[in-house]
């Protein structure tokens, strides 16, 4: 595809796009290497993990709260881990995390997993996994590290507080899907 585009005169430049605007019938792409004008722009901005937004999530992101089991799972070797989510990724990554964690608790806000039963079954049957349905995170707290998690049953309203052992921490892995990285085109393209 690249060769074909180059045959038609397309130029490929490697730079981070930091801004985009329309000006005099052109798109102007702002980069650290300068501004570039074009009749058309193809965007491949990617996506990032969706944050749920519970109190403490932003504060402990990277300090106990993670979004990638294969990237960060090993940091929680021998520790308790919570997985937040009920979809495909949550079910599969919870099973993966059992390689490192002492125990995995999955918190699902719905009455059951939302992924295919065949995907959910290994998580439901795993001896190191507990599945709590109708359950939502209330808040995550700590000091420089994550120390406690409060979650509640959204049917009964009962709140449960998990506290890490004295001087220890634990992990929370959030699997709530992905958000497209569209900040660059806000106000230019209808989203």
Where are the regions that the model predicts?
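Glycine-rich dinucleotide-binding loop and its adjacent helix/turn
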Residues: 47-88, 92-100
């Amino acid at each position: 595809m690249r060769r074909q585009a180059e045959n038609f005169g397309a130029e490929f430049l490697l730079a981070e796009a930091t801004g985009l605007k329309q000006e005099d019938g052109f798109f102007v792409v702002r980069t650290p290497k300068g501004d570039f004008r074009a009749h058309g722009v193809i965007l491949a901005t990617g996506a990032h993990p969706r944050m749920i937004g519970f109190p403490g999530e932003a504060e402990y992101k990277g300090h106990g709260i993670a979004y990638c089991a294969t990237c960060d799972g090993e940091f929680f070797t021998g520790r308790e881990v919570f997985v937040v989510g009920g979809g495909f990724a949550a079910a599969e990554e919870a099973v993966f995390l059992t390689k490192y964690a002492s125990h995995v608790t999955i918190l699902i806000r719905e009455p059951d997993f939302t992924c295919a039963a065949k995907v959910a079954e290994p998580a439901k049957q795993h001896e190191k996994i507990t599945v709590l349905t109708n359950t939502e995170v209330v808040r995550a707290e700590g000091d420089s590290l994550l120390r406690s998690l409060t979650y509640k049953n959204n049917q009964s309203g009962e709140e449960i507080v998990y506290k890490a052992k004295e001087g220890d921490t634990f992990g929370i892995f959030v699997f709530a899907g992905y958000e497209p990285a569209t900040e660059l085109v806000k106000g230019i393209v209808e989203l």
